Amino acid sequence: SSGTRTVTIADITDFHGHIERGADNATAFTVADSHNPGNMIPVSTGDLVGGSPYESAVEKDQPTLDMAKAWGLTISAIGNHEFDRGVADFNNRIADPSNGIDWLCANASAANKSPDGLLSHVRDSTIRTVNGKRIGFVGALTDALGSVATPQITRDADLDERAVDAINRVARELKRSGKVDAVVALLHADASAAADIGRDVDVVYTGHSHAIKHGTTAGGAPIYEAGSFGRNMAVQDLIITGAGRRATVRVADVDLGNGTSHTAVDGVLGVDGLNAHPAQAAWMSAGAEENDEVSRAQHIYQASATYANHTGSAVIGTLASGVNFDKQGSDKHGNTVGVLVADANRESIMKHVYAGNRLPVIGFSNNGSLRTPRLDMNGDGKVTVRE
């Protein structure tokens, strides 16, 4: 279409399997769609899975993938936590086409994304045609993968180009080919890493640092980072005039209306307890409970919670009265639950060390990746599989 049309983008990032918030996110996506009916595209900027609560982790995050399908989410950048169980597990299971998501990572080597590569289900970009406009999506993974993943994962992922350079390259190819009318970048890195993205990108969504941020690229495009754990969502309208190489794009923040808890960053909204805008009252009069996406999300969580309660309730240890392991203190300087994890890692290694070994054996933990505030969450002195 050569006229002016509006396409809405709704982005989440670093969801990390928090399916307990899945229904809130389903509501937010459907309200975003009711703002521009049939013309909303939900996206993720990575770490959709991995580092997850027990309800999702115990089933290897399949409930989260099912939740994403319920939302209608079909596009995501790869985050480092997608590789938590290895690159092969990501490619063969998480990125299996049956889950319905196009996973994007333009800075992974072309050879790795070939049919015989370790990331054969990954691509540089994908295109959606909505409301008569063609939207190109380009994804990339943080250049700091080596500092947050094991050497084996870093080798298997084979990132051979700077993330921003890869985004600029693919965006330029898309724009100059005339195949798209707008380009959206999904960069799994802190918002500051997107500063050098060029003029061929119209809007950038970032993640990884779990922050809520806004910025501007060197090319003048807005940058958004929408927090983590399903608490927030960035929603923007792309107002597109013309087509192909002659298209112009204006980006406008969307207010989802009453009940939205606004953050300090324009364009990034809280999704807990979201109600509809008065103009959307007719849609809401049917009740969110009757909405397919919301009811499916609720069912997925309820089924997963039931299974998690069954598998996670067994008591595997006890704590003396008044003793607990918690995450108080600094991620950089340690805390008692982190020391416990390091000790447990050492004990696990010691089971495989031959009796005559004279070398020191050291256990490590990454305090920044600990997701629980304390070991004995309910204070009953019993440690369960779930805890």
What are these regions (language model features)?
Residues S2-H262, T336-A344:
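Acidic, metal/ion-coordinating pockets
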Residues T13-G17, G50-Y54, K175, A193-I197, ...:
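Solvent-exposed loop/linker segments at secondary-structure transitions
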